[in-house]
């Protein structure tokens, strides 16, 4: 959808007393048939509706917060496989402690640790000095649908692949 108050990324909702944040890249068809239960979208976008559908599926499967987060994220990946059948579905999902990604066609990740250096954006004449923006204890993750910087090792997530990391 276009850029309106109802369509901005990322989207945030509450499930199990925790905030969940979601961003999606791609286009889905037939997404209006997804059942969202009590978790309602504000707008009409495929992104927000698919997020509400994912949270509804999680709530149905896990009425209480799951103890097995690895198992929960495997279930999320299965749900993403279903959404992938509707079109391109690259996504990022986080509860502030864990970050999960799912790739339909193009998704990359990078991890940066001290000693931090500078990184130059590929599509802009901009250089970021991560040493000025971080501490020696920080670990910085980047997730994007295309590599953003040169002279760094970005890792490609294979189509149909999911990834997760613990950041909390």
Residue ranges, per PLM feature:
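N-terminal segments that mediate ammonia production and transfer
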Residues: 1-168
